[in-house]
Design a protein with these regions (language model features):
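The conserved beta1-alpha1 loop
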Residues: 83-84, 218
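Primarily recognizes the serine-hydrolase "nucleophile elbow" in alpha/beta-hydrolase
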Residues: 158-160, 166-208
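Alpha-helical scaffolding within the catalytic cores
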Residues: 98-106, 198-206, 228
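Gly/Ser-rich "nucleophile elbow"/oxyanion-hole loop immediately N-terminal to the catalytic nucleophile
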Residues: 71, 75, 130-173
């Protein structure tokens, strides 16, 4: 098992240098930044915000992008896992930056910073072995090879980086929404909160999410992933008395992630969650 990294900007290089200084525990809280600094962050592109990395486990190589904070001694940082949709699959380790990653990184940098990790699923593969066009699903007994690699990566990062283990989050869109539901069901107690967007889930597994702070989103006229997935899970969670938040955007098709990640209140909720509280 090994992780390889290639810095692509001076900013990232500086961040990486600082992130191995100390592993003592201290939680960094959201902090306001000067206006000029906020403006500079807003202008940054995905290639400036992240580095290319790879992770090897049992002969499987997983490509991923990683944003790293400029770590301070004695500080541990949140970690956000972002799972992309089907359109970003491949082996370029760049397409993952198209949706989601940039607004999450920018928000984190304005509020104390965090590690943000975005693995890339190979072409023709899926985070979850499921036909997306069907109206319902049953959770596979075992994770896909791609999901198993992501799970191993997350354990490795929490063990080797200055990550606050009580502030590990996951969010994803479309295929990555399926993946968000899936990984949280397979790693109970690992994530502090989850935010699947226009994904699908087996509603009979609702009980698996009882102790997980959860918000999920879907467009009411989604033509790619039927909104019925989220509606049924919303009902199943409610019937079981499991606290959660569900937002359905009226007359919105598949892309409901743009408005979701552009909403600072939504991201503030995610980063405010602390496992065990």
């Amino acid at each position: 098992m090994k992780t390889n990294s290639t810095a692509i900007s001076a900013l990232v290089a500086l961040a990486l240098t600082g992130c191995n200084l100390d592993s003592r525990t201290k939680v960094i809280r959201p902090a306001d930044r000067p206006v000029a600094e906020v403006s500079a962050i807003a202008a940054m592109k995905g290639e400036q915000l992240t580095e290319k990395c790879s992770f090897e486990k049992d002969g499987y190589t997983l490509l991923y992008r990683r944003h790293s904070p400029k770590c301070e001694p004695g500080v541990k940082y949140p970690l956000v896992l972002f799972l992309h949709g089907a359109g970003e699959r491949g082996n370029d380790n760049t397409a993952t930056l198209v949706h989601g990653v940039v607004p999450i990184c920018r928000y984190a940098m304005r509020h104390g910073d965090a590690f943000v990790v975005a693995p890339q699923c190979p072409s023709g593969k899926k985070w979850v072995d499921q036909d997306w066009s069907t109206q319902s699903m049953r959770r596979p007994e075992t994770p896909s090879a791609e999901m198993a690699a992501v799970m191993a990566l997350m354990r490795e990062l929490v063990a080797t980086l200055p990550v606050d283990p009580t502030r590990v989050y996951v969010t994803g869109i479309s295929m990555g929404g399926f993946g968000t539901w899936d990984i949280t069901s397979r790693m109970p107690g690992f994530f502090a909160a989850a935010m699947p967007i226009c994904g699908g889930v087996d509603e009979t597994t609702a009980e698996l999410y009882r102790r997980l702070p959860l918000r999920f989103f879907h467009g009411s006229v989604d033509g790619a992933v039927p909104v019925g997935y989220s509606r049924r899970m919303d009902k199943a969670l409610a019937d079981a008395g499991i606290e959660h938040g569900y937002t359905e955007y009226p007359n919105v098709n598949h892309d409901c992630w743009t408005r979701t990640y552009a909403n600072d209140d939504v991201l503030a909720w995610l980063f405010a969650q602390i496992r065990g509280r």
